């Protein structure tokens, strides 16, 4: 049984790609048709590739892989943080700092500084410092937490990276590839899929689509670490009585949405 149904994908808008003029020809094989100037992603392929991504992530987690979730645009930020935390992993959901992976030593120093500032507040050091200095420290902490809070406790460079919109996160993908870190990604019709190891053809601009795919991969991690019975299934994504099983039904839905 597929880990994500056709109906779930349709309801989340996973099938809507970009305007045809913005497409990347390398995504042609993942596109079913075009409607009103918008490419429609072939959801039968999305179902297949989502299954493969789920298996990949589950198996990686079963081998104690460290997974980094990356999604810095507003449509992805909340889901990336929530699902990374739920699955006991790590995330970056604000601007990717160049060298986050390839200059990990420097990043670790900044993380150490963040932890030092937190300790200063907890042990009472703030109480004996001038207010102006405390204000500066709080400002520094806020900035460090914004960019590094999601990887503050990451024990090492990740074994796997999951990316929402690799077109936007090109620097992150390049760093991962340089270090030999496999990349799992939601890939829209405007993206070059060549640098992605495990592709999920999908609309990466809709909040519900991002949430659906990201939550399912978090489920895979939980299953890999704790077993299938431990997977927490989101109620809104639970299988319903009806299924959209054919490409023809997808086209009917798309045409209806664009009518």
Curated annotation (Swiss-Prot):
It holds the Pfam family Ribosomal_S2. This is Small ribosomal subunit protein uS2. The keyword Ribonucleoprotein applies. It comes from the Bacteria. Signal peptide: none annotated. Gene3D superfamilies: Glucose-6-phosphate isomerase like protein, domain 1, Helix hairpin bin. HAMAP family: Ribosomal_uS2_B. CDD domains: RPS2 (cd01425). GO terms for biological process: translation. GO terms for cellular component: cytosolic small ribosomal subunit. Keywords: Ribonucleoprotein, Ribosomal protein. PANTHER family: 30S RIBOSOMAL PROTEIN S2 PROKARYOTIC AND ORGANELLAR, SMALL RIBOSOMAL SUBUNIT PROTEIN US2M. Belongs to the universal ribosomal protein uS2 family. GO terms for molecular function: structural constituent of ribosome. NCBIfam families: rpsB_bact. PROSITE patterns: RIBOSOMAL_S2_1 (PS00962). The lineage of its organism: Bacteria, Bacillati, Bacillota, Bacilli, Lactobacillales.
């Amino acid at each position: 049984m597929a880990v994500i149904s056709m109906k779930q994908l349709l309801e989340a808008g996973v099938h809507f790609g970009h305007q045809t003029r913005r497409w990347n020809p390398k995504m042609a094989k993942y596109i079913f048709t075009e409607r009103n100037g918008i490419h429609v992603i072939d959801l039968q392929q999305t179902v297949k590739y989502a299954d493969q991504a789920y298996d990949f992530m589950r198996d990686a987690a079963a081998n104690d892989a460290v997974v980094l979730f990356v999604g810095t645009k507003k449509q992805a930020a909340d889901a990336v943080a929530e699902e990374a935390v739920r699955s006991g992993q790590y995330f970056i959901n604000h601007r990717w700092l160049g060298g986050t992976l390839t200059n990990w030593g420097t990043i670790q120093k900044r993380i150490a500084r963040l932890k030092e500032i937190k300790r200063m507040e907890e042990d009472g050091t703030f109480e004996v410092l001038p207010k102006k200095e405390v204000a500066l420290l709080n400002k520094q902490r806020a900035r460090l937490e914004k960019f590094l809070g999601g990887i503050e406790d990451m024990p090492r460079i990740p074994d796997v990276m999951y990316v929402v919109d690799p077109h936007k996160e090109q620097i992150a993908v390049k760093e991962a590839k340089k270090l030999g870190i496999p990349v799992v990604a939601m890939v829209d019709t405007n993206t070059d899929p060549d640098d992605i190891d495990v592709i999920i053809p999908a609309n990466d601009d809709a909040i519900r689509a991002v949430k659906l795919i990201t939550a399912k991969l978090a489920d895979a991690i939980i299953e890999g670490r704790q077993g299938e019975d431990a997977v927490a299934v989101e109620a809104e994504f639970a299988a319903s009585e009806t299924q959209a099983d054919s490409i023809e039904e997808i086209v009917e839905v798309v045409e209806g949405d664009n009518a």
